[in-house]
């Protein structure tokens, strides 16, 4: 708070959605990718906060009656159930806005040359996050998802949808982490992009698997939600065993993309393992 007025109920809804648990995979990917190429900086912290805030906003809006109409998220009432629909919409709007406020905030950099370099990095990070979360990324994926209800998709169409809806923000997290450091080269960025493409899709495949194999008490949301909403999933297209094979293939692709990094990318490897082994 910068001393201005704010609406307490709106702030409460924002905190409820941003701080009420979750896996924090996206900010962890920011830090892990930064450590893979160099050291974390103040911009790394800003990027981690920003991607999680965008993710929280997207969940609020996804859960709304006009979208997925869910009443349970992370084992708790969804934002529009806990508060009301209008407050939930505004909380999502505000969380999206504050993400870019954090990402573009002035950095405390001691050396002038770093200050100049990091201003350019901030602008690049803002552009990446905006593109990945907007009409060419996450929002596009959600639009395709809504249009796919009661439709039959090919595996290629389903993959494209989730590359946008889920993978775009995961890819942005990894790019922002690497760019937030003092030293990263184009070869490293290209390898991290391949890792991001594979692990972003693997995340969604595992989500589809958990949707049919994990009980609500562990999953934190209603089991079989996508099937109930008549949405195509990797399990519905490939079967459970086929979806598990798909997740393992994507995991191997992600780990292979990190071959040239050595031990500095161990956190990214660990996160890849977690993503396909998780139970919620």
For the regions a language model picked out, list residue spans one by one.
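Mg2+-dependent prenyl diphosphate-binding active-site environment of isoprenoid biosynthetic enzymes
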Residues: 4-258, 264-276
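Short cytosolic juxtamembrane segments of multi-pass membrane proteins
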Residues: 278-280
């Amino acid at each position: 708070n910068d001393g201005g007025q704010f609406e307490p109920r709106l702030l409460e809804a924002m905190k409820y959605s941003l701080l009420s648990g979750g896996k924090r995979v996206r900010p962890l990917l920011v830090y892990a990718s930064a450590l893979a190429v160099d050291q974390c900086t103040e911009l790394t912290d800003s990027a981690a906060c920003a991607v999680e805030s965008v993710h929280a906003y997207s969940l609020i809006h996804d859960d709304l009656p006009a979208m997925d109409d869910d009443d349970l998220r992370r084992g708790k009432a969804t934002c529009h159930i806990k508060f009301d629909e209008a407050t939930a919409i505004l909380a999502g709007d505000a969380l999206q806005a504050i993400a870019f406020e954090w990402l573009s905030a002035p950095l405390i950099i001691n050396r002038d040359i770093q200050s100049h370099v990091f201003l350019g990095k901030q602008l690049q990070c803002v552009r990446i996050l905006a593109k990945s979360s907007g009409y060419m990324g996450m929002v596009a994926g959600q639009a395709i998802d809504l249009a796919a209800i009661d439709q039959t998709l090919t595996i290629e169409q389903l993959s494209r949808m989730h590359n946008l809806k889920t993978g775009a923000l995961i890819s942005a997290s990894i790019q922002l982490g690497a760019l937030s450091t003092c030293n990263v080269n184009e070869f490293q960025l290209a390898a991290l992009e391949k890792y991001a493409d594979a692990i972003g899709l693997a995340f969604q495949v595992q989500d589809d698997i958990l949707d049919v194999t994990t009980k609500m008490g562990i999953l934190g949301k209603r089991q079989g939600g996508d099937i109930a909403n008549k949405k195509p999933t990797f399990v519905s297209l490939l079967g459970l065993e086929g979806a598990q094979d798909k997740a393992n293939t994507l995991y191997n692709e992600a780990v292979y993309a990190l071959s040239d990094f050595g031990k500095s990318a161990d956190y990214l490897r660990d996160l890849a393992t977690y993503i396909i082994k998780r139970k919620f």
